């Protein structure tokens, strides 16, 4: 299979606790990022379904781990956004722990899709996610979101800066300029996910 039809992606199930997850087969791609980086919008743009991944108008309100099936055995997982400053500290800590626990303990994860606002990349909690990827030896695909908000030369400068910092930490990563609103980077995202599917699912069956 050279390409997947992401338009046929469907919602599987939501979980509030890691221990409740009862899906064990197949592989997963984890979408991770701060609560205002546009994770749900990216999934909706990828699948061309406006309401597949529901999102709150208030950042940080989505607290569930949401599973979506692209094809049998290949899933996208939308994790709770971290770092929402207006949430109480205890609530933020619980959300962050939920994300970290899933990323550290879930063996089915084969790729981290780390979404960062291109204007404010590599914040503290992003770097924690990167450290988990280093420990687990998992590839990272960085989506520098909202790239339409800045000029092209600034986009390049930001991407170069992120590349230089990641290049000393990671053996395998990719950076894509992305905008759900302007439909920028969607085809590149599909190609990267197709590659991960082929590498970890088809070739290892």
From Swiss-Prot:
Residues at which Mg(2+) binds: 40, 62
Instruction: Determine if Metal-binding is one of this entry's keywords.
Output: yes
Q: Which parts of the sequence belong to the EngB-type G domain?
A: 25-199
SUPFAM superfamilies cross-referenced by the UniProt entry = P-loop containing nucleoside triphosphate hydrolases
Name the coenzymes or cofactors required: Mg(2+)
Q: What are the binding positions for GTP in this chain?
A: 33-40, 60-64, 78-81, 145-148, 178-180
Pfam families, alphabetized: MMR_HSR1 (PF01926)
- Mind telling me what this protein is named? Probable GTP-binding protein EngB
Organism equals Buchnera aphidicola subsp. Acyrthosiphon pisum (strain APS) (Acyrthosiphon pisum symbiotic bacterium)
Highest classification ranks of the organism: Bacteria, Pseudomonadati, Pseudomonadota, Gammaproteobacteria, Enterobacterales
* Name of the gene encoding the protein in the UniProt record: engB
């Amino acid at each position: 299979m050279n390409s997947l039809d992401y338009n046929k992606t469907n919602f599987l199930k939501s979980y509030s606790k890691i221990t409740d997850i009862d899906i064990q087969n197949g592989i997963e791609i984890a979408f991770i990022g701060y609560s205002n980086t546009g994770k749900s919008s990216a999934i909706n743009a990828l699948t061309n379904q406006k309401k597949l991944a529901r999102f709150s108008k208030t950042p940080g309100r989505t607290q569930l781990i949401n599973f979506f099936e692209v094809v049998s055995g290949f899933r996208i997982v939308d994790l709770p956004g971290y770092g929402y400053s207006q949430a109480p500290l205890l609530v933020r800590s619980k959300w962050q722990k939920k994300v970290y626990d899933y990323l550290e303990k879930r063996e089915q994860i084969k790729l981290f899709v780390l979404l960062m606002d291109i204007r404010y990349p590599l914040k503290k909690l992003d770097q924690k996610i990167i450290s988990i990827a280093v420990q687990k030896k998992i590839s990272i695909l960085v989506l520098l979101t909202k790239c339409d908000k800045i000029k092209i030369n600034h986009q390049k400068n930001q991407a170069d800066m992120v590349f230089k910092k990641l290049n000393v930490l990671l053996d395998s990563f990719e950076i894509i300029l992305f905008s759900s609103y302007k439909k920028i980077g969607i085809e590149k995202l599909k190609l990267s996910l197709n590659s991960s599917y082929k590498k970890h699912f088809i070739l290892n069956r």
